[in-house]
Amino acid sequence: MANDKNEDQKEEETKTLQEKYDELLEELDSKNKELAKINEDLEKQKEETQEYISLSQRLQADFENFKKINEKKSKDIIKFANEPLIKNILDSYEDLERALENSKTEKELRDGVELIYSKIKDVLTKEGLEEIPAKGEKFDPFKHEALMVANDENVENGYIIDELMKGYTLKGKVIKYSKVRVCKK
């Protein structure tokens, strides 16, 4: 009986061990499946990461190309910004050349030069150039440059007596100050 009991006990222990072994195998199988899923997800993440890196590199390259193209366009815009003005002045330049070549008398030359002066003035006015009024105006240091001062009984203190050189604005911005003589008493 003791043997039967021992055998029953051994059988029971074996059965319990077998059950634990089976449970552990199931748990191991489950963990292996989880690990396989994690590895699969990790591979997908690696692929996505690589795609993002590749996309980022392409975008960076595209952006660099975009910057280079815009830089070239900007340089071209600056380089050729005066083209319309030059084209307009070229007509007057050629007129001046013809006037010099074809004028027989001083009057013809003067008439030709006056016509050319008028054309150039029109071109510059269309481009936004305006003369700064000076003579008889109150001195304005933002528009005028006083080269001389003088006392003139006919002119109020601080007003311009003479304009020595004309000044100009381009679309409202002073590009050349009028050189003037100012009355100072």
Curated annotation (Swiss-Prot):
One of its GO terms (molecular function) is unfolded protein binding. GO terms for cellular component: cytoplasm. Gene3D superfamilies: 3.90.20.20, Head domain of nucleotide exchange factor GrpE. The keyword Iron does not apply. Pfam families: GrpE (PF01025). GO terms for biological process: protein folding. Keywords: Chaperone, Cytoplasm, Stress response. Belongs to the GrpE family. Participates actively in the response to hyperosmotic and heat shock by preventing the aggregation of stress-denatured proteins, in association with DnaK and GrpE. It is the nucleotide exchange factor for DnaK and may function as a thermosensor. Unfolded proteins bind initially to DnaJ; upon interaction with the DnaJ-bound protein, DnaK hydrolyzes its bound ATP, resulting in the formation of a stable complex. GrpE releases ADP from DnaK; ATP binding to DnaK triggers the release of the substrate protein, thus completing the reaction cycle. This is Protein GrpE.
